[in-house]
């Protein structure tokens, strides 16, 4: 009888679903092949409206699961909003779920229940936030105004300022975009706005690229914005790209180009408001708050990084300090994420770029795919945890993005045990240096492997 009911459900293509991504047109989502109209629920969502608007008009199966690890209540509540079934997919579909992730989530729930801890709050979170805001403001003042006449000292202080920008991004912005700081959506919203304000980069852009794109389709070419989809790129990191002679040297030049990341980000983030996509990932509709935050953030950036400092420094000196700070900021962030996903032992797959083709299915459960495309490093090092903002435990983060980085170390043994039980290899490097070397070796091998043969998407 249940199968008969399923046969007669109304069918919707992904393009039809994509039109329902605003409150005016209705908020539709698809989960596990079923379509839900959650327009009436949006104002009652404990996580706020904007999180659902970010997810609207698309398949959110894996986001839904990974952002509700502590309770099954949302799954039970959804049934009343069901309106039909998905007929076509926009992006790859993961194979049917194994028991791996459900077992893992159950163990994590037990851990927090026994320890009586809140997965989104700890006093350590408050201490870290106070520190990163203080460090950012103090390092800005000292690097721009404290030693005006000392060129070489200011060059060194520019590097210190880049560190404060990096820690601010990794400790505050990264957790806020994943709803991993407090249970209050207003906290996430305003913390995100301070990223626009203090860093001059769009929090809304990051949420679309990182949360909607990268976390769902990790290391899937033509879906994950972090590995690109253009035929010609400054590096080759997948076997689905054409190979050019310059790539033989990418292990030498690519790390330096990573230093341009922060500048590129600030120059390109406006596209989230104008182009409607980041790579192949459709972007959500921005609220007035997000647009205003973006505009004010850019103005504040120009005033505080250029106009005011120019009253104290020559243009040449100021640009020197600026590019030093931005170069090291770009390096810090880029390597923080690149070493976690681009290495020889990590999986890379691809999906079709042809709109008329059905996307290639991924031959793995989503959670297992996350483990096979990601590696951790320095799992017992508090220094690695602090200076990476928790991304040294990237496997933990991808499986439980809405849990605060404060608890990542506690979850590692749980994940290792469940991986052993299900015979899933957990990729761990002993140190950051080992992870860094694995990434450089990967760049070298991708550029110099004589047996390289471009794979087709269907391989």
Swiss-Prot record:
Annotated Cytochrome b5 heme-binding domain residues: 9-87
Motif Histidine box-2 positions after renumbering to this chain: 210-215
Reported cofactor(s): Fe cation
Location of the motif Histidine box-3: 394-398
Family annotation (Gene3D superfamilies): Cytochrome b5-like heme/steroid binding domain (3.10.120.10)
Pfam families the UniProt entry points to: Cyt-b5, FA_desaturase
Gene Ontology BP terms: lipid metabolic process; long-chain fatty acid biosynthetic process; unsaturated fatty acid biosynthetic process
UniProt topology in membrane: Multi-pass membrane protein
Binding site for heme: 45, 68
CDD domains membership: Delta6-FADS-like (cd03506)
GO molecular-function term, one example from the UniProt record: metal ion binding
Superkingdom, taxonomy of origin: Eukaryota
Localization per Swiss-Prot or TrEMBL: Membrane
PROSITE patterns hit by this protein: CYTOCHROME_B5_1, CYTOCHROME_B5_2
Transmembrane parts of this sequence: 121-141, 151-171, 187-207, 289-309, 315-335
Protein name (record): Probable Delta(5) fatty acid desaturase C
Cellular component terms (Gene Ontology): membrane
Motif Histidine box-1, residue numbers: 174-178
Keywords of this entry: Electron transport, Fatty acid biosynthesis, Fatty acid metabolism, Heme, Iron, Lipid biosynthesis, Lipid metabolism, Membrane, Metal-binding, Oxidoreductase, Transmembrane, Transmembrane helix, Transport
């Amino acid at each position: 009888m249940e199968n008969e009911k399923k046969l007669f459900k109304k069918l919707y293509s992904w393009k039809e679903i994509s039109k329902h991504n605003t409150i005016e047109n209705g908020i539709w989502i698809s989960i596990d092949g079923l379509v839900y109209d959650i327009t009436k629920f949006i104002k009652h969502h404990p996580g706020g409206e904007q999180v659902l608007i970010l997810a609207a008009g698309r398949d959110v199966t894996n986001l839904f699961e990974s952002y509700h690890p502590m309770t099954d209540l949302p799954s039970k509540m959804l049934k009343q909003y069901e309106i039909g079934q998905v007929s076509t997919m926009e992006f790859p579909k993961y194979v049917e779920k194994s028991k791996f992730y459900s077992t893992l989530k159950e163990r994590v729930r037990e851990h927090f229940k026994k320890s009586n801890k809140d997965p989104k709050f700890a006093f350590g979170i408050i201490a870290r936030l106070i520190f990163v805001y203080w460090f950012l403001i103090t390092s800005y003042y000292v690097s721009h105004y404290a030693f005006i006449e000392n060129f070489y000292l200011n060059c060194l202080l520019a590097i210190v300022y880049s560190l404060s920008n990096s820690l601010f991004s990794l400790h505050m912005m990264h957790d806020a975009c994943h709803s991993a700081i407090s249970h209050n959506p207003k906290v996430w919203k305003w913390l995100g706005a301070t990223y626009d304000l203090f860093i001059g980069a769009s929090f809304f852009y990051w949420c679309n690229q990182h949360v909607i794109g990268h976390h769902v389709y990790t290391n899937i070419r033509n879906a994950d914005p972090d590995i690109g989809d253009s035929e010609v790129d400054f590096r080759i990191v997948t076997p689905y790209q054409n190979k050019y002679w310059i790539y033989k040297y990418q292990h030498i030049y690519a790390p330096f180009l990573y230093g341009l990341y922060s500048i590129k980000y600030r120059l390109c983030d406006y596209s989230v408001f104008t182009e409607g996509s980041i790579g192949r990932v459709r972007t959500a509709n921005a609220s007035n708050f997000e647009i205003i935050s973006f505009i004010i953030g850019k103005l504040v950036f120009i005033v505080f990084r250029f106009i005011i400092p120019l009253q104290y420094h020559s243009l040449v000196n100021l640009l020197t300090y600026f590019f030093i700070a931005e170069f090291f900021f770009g390096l810090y962030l880029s390597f923080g994420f690149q070493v976690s996903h681009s290495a020889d032992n990590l999986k890379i797959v691809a999906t079709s770029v042809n709109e008329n083709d059905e996307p290639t299915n991924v031959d793995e459960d989503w959670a297992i795919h996350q483990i096979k495309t990601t590696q951790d490093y320095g799992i017992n090092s508090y220094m690695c945890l602090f200076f990476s903002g928790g991304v040294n435990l990237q496997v933990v983060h991808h499986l439980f993005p809405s849990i605060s980085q404060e608890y990542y170390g506690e979850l590692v043994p749980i994940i290792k045990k469940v991986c052993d039980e299900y015979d899933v290899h957990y990729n761990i490097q002993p140190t950051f240096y080992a992870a860094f070397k694995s990434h450089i070796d990967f760049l070298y091998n991708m550029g110099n492997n004589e047996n390289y043969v471009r794979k087709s998407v269907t391989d």
